[in-house]
């Protein structure tokens, strides 16, 4: 895993693009922690025992267990603590080059101006930081679907490296 390979060792802060929640069962979360050899603190995730029903849990608690304590999330909702409309260039220049890790877990396919959305994502990320992108290849619920060549091309055009790339297939 990227965690076991030390990729997040220096990661102190994160920005989730879009408000994110854990959408896995308690058993799946426990298994994921075993894979990374991180102690699973059951009390922090007990709400997941009711998944998919019950209260949802912010990803903030997952990142904290990985040692990333400065959690931030943005949303287009004007009530959001960090309002960012990814369709347009970043207005708040103090956010540029601020985050060690910026995630797109099913957010940027909802933005019409895809090029600007990923440019903003890049600008939010610190030098030598990470952009973690997890997108549906087909179906999904946004305006766009991407394939690997989109992300490989984006990386090549901007002199970035792809650390890990894969397709995940859900069978259940």
Regions found by a protein language model. Name each.
Residues 1-76, 163, 171-172:
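N-terminal accessory regions of S-adenosyl-L-methionine
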Residues 128-137:
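Conserved beta-strand signature within the Rossmann-like core of class I S-adenosyl-L-methionine
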Residues 104-110:
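Hydrophobic adenine-recognition pocket in adenosine-nucleotide-binding enzymes
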Residues 20-21, 136-140, 168-170:
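Short "lid" loop at the C-terminus of a central beta-strand within the Rossmann-like core
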Residues 84-102:
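A short acidic, Gly/Pro-enriched loop at the edge of an enzyme's catalytic core
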Residues 142-168:
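Conserved Class I S-adenosyl-L-methionine
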């Amino acid at each position: 895993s990227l965690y076991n390979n030390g990729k997040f060792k220096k990661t102190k802060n994160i920005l989730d693009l879009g408000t994110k929640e854990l959408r896995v069962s308690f058993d799946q979360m426990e298994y994921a922690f075993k894979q990374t050899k991180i102690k699973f603190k059951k009390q922090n995730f007990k709400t997941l025992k009711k998944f998919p029903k019950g209260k949802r849990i912010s990803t903030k608690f997952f990142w904290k267990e990985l040692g990333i304590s400065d959690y931030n999330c943005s949303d287009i909702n004007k009530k959001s603590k960090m309002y960012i409309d990814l369709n347009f260039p970043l207005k708040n220049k103090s956010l540029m080059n601020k985050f060690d890790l910026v995630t797109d877990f099913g957010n940027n396919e909802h933005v019409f101006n895809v090029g600007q959305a990923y440019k903003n994502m890049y600008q939010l990320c610190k030098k030598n930081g990470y952009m973690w992108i997890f997108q549906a290849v087909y179906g999904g619920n946004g305006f766009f679907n991407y394939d690997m060549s989109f992300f490989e091309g984006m990386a090549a055009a901007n002199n970035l490296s792809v650390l890990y790339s894969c397709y995940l297939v859900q069978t259940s």
